[in-house]
A protein has these predicted regions:
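Hydrophobic/aromatic residues within well-ordered alpha-helical segments
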Residues: 13, 20, 24, 28, ...
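Hydrophobic recognition helices of helix-based DNA-binding modules
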Residues: 17-20, 24, 28, 32, ...
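Amphipathic alpha-helical packing segments from all-alpha helical-bundle domains
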Residues: 55, 69-115, 124
């Protein structure tokens, strides 16, 4: 698509960016719905958090790993936020929301609902594995091997939590 064609559809660079963020919000919600996971914070839908099991979280985590690494749109968005987080407070906030504090808080809330002690610390460890493997995947020649290692690591963590 040429720049001219792009600007015929959008008013400005800001409009393009806002549409990208909106699409990410939609896709995030769709992923959660597809795996019967809460779409929003625990305060907004506490009953949905009560219905999640560790096995549900493992399946959802595997799907999110594929989404953030294999989906062209999501992967490009993740990489863009990683680079742009240092250029503005807005990008830093989005980076935190989508890739650091947001997911870690989400996992903590799920762990608390499941009844896991020290939920905050264990959620940080759980999400750290996801984040680490995103980076491993990006630089790997054998991406399937990294994906398999990720699944194994997540399953091991969950076994320790049971």
């Amino acid at each position: 698509m040429t720049k001219g064609a792009l600007y015929r559809h959008y008013k400005s660079k800001r409009d393009i960016f806002d549409c990208i963020v909106y699409r990410m919000e939609q896709q995030d919600g769709e992923q959660a719905v597809e795996y019967d996971m809460p779409e929003e914070e625990k305060e907004k839908m506490p009953e949905q958090y009560e219905n999640v099991s560790l096995d549900d979280l493992v399946e959802y985590s595997k799907s999110m790993f594929e989404y953030w690494t294999e989906d062209d749109f999501a992967s490009s968005f993740r990489k863009m936020l990683t680079i742009e987080q240092f250029r503005s407070e807005e990008m830093q906030n989005l980076y935190q929301q989508y890739l650091v504090a947001g997911p870690a808080s989400y996992v903590k809330d799920l762990f608390e609902s499941i009844g896991i002690a020290n939920a905050k610390d264990k959620a940080a460890g759980f999400y750290a594995v996801m984040y680490f493997y995103y980076s491993m995947y990006d630089g790997a020649e054998d991406k399937q091997n990294v994906k398999d290692e990720f699944v194994s690591a997540i399953k091991s963590l969950v076994q320790e939590l049971k």
